[in-house]
Amino acid sequence: MTIKLIVGLANPGAEYAATRHNAGAWFVDLLAERLRAPLREEAKFFGYTSRVTLGSEDVRLLVPTTFMNLSGKAVAAMASFFRINPDEILVAHDELDLPPGVAKFKLGGGHGGHNGLKDIISKLGNNPNFHRLRIGIGHPGDKNKVVGFVLGKPPVSEQKLIDEAIDEAARCTEMWFTDGLTKATNRLHAFKAQ
């Protein structure tokens, strides 16, 4: 099993760029930078894309330019065009159930109320069996405050922790292609930014 498409979820536009909900895009932006593969807008895939080599694999990067709840449109367009199966996709997204400074890989599962994941599952024919990179952003403590929280900007102290976790996640994603998922997962899951 190899990953052929790495997606970073986000809302488009400058007003959302620094919000917690865009943590997935921060990850893909960093990966593109590390691999010197700038993202370019590609209308037919409804997003910013790039092509990279990881290990010996040809991998596409994607940050949808749709709103979060329509992310599946971009993912399905790219998956269909390049004949990529759900289990060959890694979707990076913000995760309320993990604290800032932590990131974890996961295969399959529900959407946990995340509208981006919900739409991707739906557009992939109700198939949830894609890989996820869950980037911890913490939880406001009250479910009624979640929308304002994910669309808010983290304070500097939390941003630093999130950035460190994303940095480690980028290293571990590269490691996945050279040393395998088990090693990459063990390393990432042992990490906690201080």
Curated annotation (Swiss-Prot):
User: Cross-referenced SUPFAM superfamilies, in alphabetical order?
Assistant: Peptidyl-tRNA hydrolase-like
Single GO molecular-function term? Answer: tRNA binding
Site Stabilizes the basic form of H active site to accept a proton: which residues?
D94
Which EC main class describes this enzyme?
hydrolase
The record describes its quaternary structure and partners as:
Monomer.
Q: Kindly give the HAMAP family that the UniProt entry links to this protein.
A: Pept_tRNA_hydro_bact
Protein name as it appears in the record: Peptidyl-tRNA hydrolase
The scientific name of the source species is: Shigella flexneri
* Lineage of producing organism: Bacteria, Pseudomonadati, Pseudomonadota, Gammaproteobacteria, Enterobacterales
Q: Gene behind this chain?
A: pth
